[in-house]
Amino acid sequence: MSFSTLMDKRERGSFDSQFLIAMPGLDDGNFARSVIYICAHSDAGAMGFIINRPQQITFTDILLHLKLVDSNDAIMLPNRTREFPIQCGGPVESGRGFVLHSDDYLSESSIPVSDDISLTATLDIVRAISNGRGPQKATMMLGYAGWGPGQLENEIANNGWLNCPAAEELIFDRGLDNKYERALALMGVDARMLSTDAGHA
């Protein structure tokens, strides 16, 4: 199921604006110890973004690739722009960029995900960020995680994931190393005590 189809068909599914937290038994290399923010969930499937996987490419690299700046301009970019976070959002459409952001920035192409968070996947927000006119809180994801009809529900029922309400501060926090433990802590779970047989919230 494509990103556009899932977003077009989205309803207020039971896992909208939830975190999925990988159980220890989930050994898929794409998702082991991952925390995923679910943006859309309906009968058509689900999609979301891994929020604790670093990406080697930098925002400056992206600006150069898109020819929004040249090499001379890139040197002059302010630190806030050069250090803008890029993450691996998931294995689907991994060459495509998506920006999760606070709702103080909205364009015609922005899609509300929750009361406070929107998603924009067009060049206008990249330009705005590069010019210092972007949202106060934002992170760029390359790719996303997607599930077909009923697939996510089955994975949760089979103890592949824990789920809990998402916390905005964790989505936009640039410290990725301990997000897994912090997401579990939202549920009162100590990662050291978690077994592959635990249930879900």
UniProtKB/Swiss-Prot annotation:
SUPFAM superfamilies: VC0467-like. It comes from the Bacteria. This is UPF0301 protein Atu0781. The lineage of its organism: Bacteria, Pseudomonadati, Pseudomonadota, Alphaproteobacteria, Hyphomicrobiales. Belongs to the UPF0301 (AlgH) family. Pfam families: DUF179. GO terms for cellular component: cytosol. InterPro entries: AlgH-like. HAMAP family: UPF0301.
